[in-house]
Every structure is written in C-alpha cells, then in structure tokens.
C-alpha cells in the first residue's frame, strides 16, 4: 500500500511512499540518484504524499497539490481528467512526471541539464536535488540545502535501484472462474481461500513470481511455495508471499524445487478431499510456511491475504470474479539492481529535523 491523504506523513509513511517511487521510476529508466534527488524535493514539498493540498486547504485548485505541489493544482488535475485517470493517485502523479519528461514540460533548464538528461544522471543525489529545485520546483526561497540532505538520506536508506529485480505478482491462471469464494459455506468458512476451475480439466497455472517449493503434502494433494524475493502486489504493497496450490495429483514437484515467473506450476485436479476438478488457492503474508489452522475451515496459518489484493490480473479473462476487486497493474518487472544501501537506517534520529521539512512551512513550487 501507499499513503495518500491530505495530511503530513510520518517518517515511516514517507519511507513506504519513497520506496514505491524508487521502484516505479527505476523500472522506467531513472537512476537511483535522480529519483532520490527528486525525493529530497518531494519531502519538502509534500512529505512525499500524493494526496496533500498546500496548507491542507483541500479543493483549493489555485494552490499546490500532490507530490511536487503542482501550482495551480488545476493544471495537473485537468491533465489527469483528460487522461481518464484518478488525480489523487500515486501512479497517476508518477505518470504525469514521466509525461513531463517526454514532453519537455515543467522543466526550465537552469542548470545546464535537460529533464531527459536529469533522469539518467549519476551525479550525487545532493547535486541532483539542487538541480531539480532550480529547474523544476522553483520555489520562492531557492536557498534550501536541506533538500540535498534529504536526497542523500533517501539514497542511503532506500533499498534497490534499477528495480532491484522486484517482480509483479501475476495471477497464476489465464482465466478467473470461481466456484467457491472467501468464507464459502461448503469448505471455506472463516477463510480467504478461493476455488477456481479452468476451461478444461487439468487446466494449467503458472508461477506468479520466482519462487521455491517449501512443503509437500501428499495426503491432501498440496504444495506450498514462497516468493524468492519481495514482490509488488496488485494493491501496491511490497512483501514476501507464501501460498498453497491444492488438488493436483500426482504432485509434480518436491520441496526445494525452484521456478521462474511464468514457469508451469501445476494443474487443476481431483486429489485430496475434493468433489470435482479445480484448484484451491490460499495466500499469506511473509516467507515462512507455518502449516494449517482452522477458522473454522482449514486455511494457511499466518496472516491471510485477499488473493485479489496480491495477484494482478493483467491479461487474465474474468469469467466469474465473484464481485471481488480484481486489479491490473502498470508495474514492469525490474531487471536487477545494486541492492541499495540499508546499513544506515540508524541515522533516522539524527535526521528528524529533515523529516520535519519545510513542507510544514508552506514552501511550494
């Protein structure tokens, strides 16, 4: 999840949003230095909050709004409306910034660097924060070295760059046809398990991300899997996930089997306690298989997640989605990264004055 509201964000909330922005823009070709230079400015402008109105004056479109405090807000809002996308939305605002890069908008080349050159630059985050301040934000007070400090902070305390290999969790089957939903009266009472059928018996489903088989239950015909890394979920959250596929027989893999995203993972089936060919699916937060529990029917022990919040349904045919909020995503899988620098998180207290940034004092673009 990301934080979108008309309030000043806390440190922990800003970090969630900043990490999302880093991941998103890395996968669109930006360097980590350029992203963090912009984040140093966003922190002062909006506390990295896409829902923030200048001075908390919600609806005053003559003032600033959003991550970079577009002023007047109506310029950005009208653009979003013309694009048919929600304006108070993280992805929409990042799309606007990418549009500005591609259309040479908003940027005044005051530091001998174009916007397209900026997003590819490997200058220091501090230098790039000052360039972004001068050429993009152009506030009433241009003397704000704190934005450079903030840019350096984000560079040192966010993980990844170039996407860090972050993959979108893709729904495993190419169709959605539900025969029993969450809290189903037949065998899902109290659980978030869902049963799916294919277009034929023994219908295939595929690995939603790079993953490893961590448990095999022959008597009940199930395999448990964990993601090898954190994944981007359909609801925008980044987390490890663990799930079970139930009813294929015989089971096709042993514990320790590794699959790449898109590899064949299994088929619908009639193994275990079953009344017809289908696939029973259940997912929890985290990377540890903890066995099963009863709620009162059986499900994975741990924090269950809604399948429709975890797995994006890009290019999936929905025949019967049971009315659930299935989501597509614009996320593009990362292709690696430098692993970031996570060893300076203890400096948070030293930077608390930075986090009470001049966004609280009304600076605006």
UniProtKB/Swiss-Prot annotation:
It is an enzyme of class 3 (hydrolase). Residues 1-159 are annotated as: Lysozyme-like glycosidase. Residues 160-165 are annotated as: Linker. The gene is 13. It is found in: Virion. The lineage of its organism: Viruses, Duplodnaviria, Heunggongvirae, Uroviricota, Caudoviricetes. It comes from the Viruses. Substrate binds at residues 45, 71, 106, 137-140. Its EC number is 3.2.1.-, 3.4.-.-. The active site is at residue 45. It comes from Bacillus phage PZA. May serve as a plug to restrain the highly pressurized packaged genome and thus would be the first virion protein to contact the host cell wall, degrading the peptidoglycan layer and thereby facilitating viral genome entry into the host bacteria. Acts probably as a multifunctional enzyme that degrades N-acetylglucosamine polymers (in vitro) and cleaves the peptide cross-links of the host cell wall. Essential for the tail assembly. One of its GO terms (molecular function) is metal ion binding. InterPro entries: Dup_hybrid_motif (IPR011055), Phage_lysozyme2 (IPR041219). This is Morphogenesis protein 1.
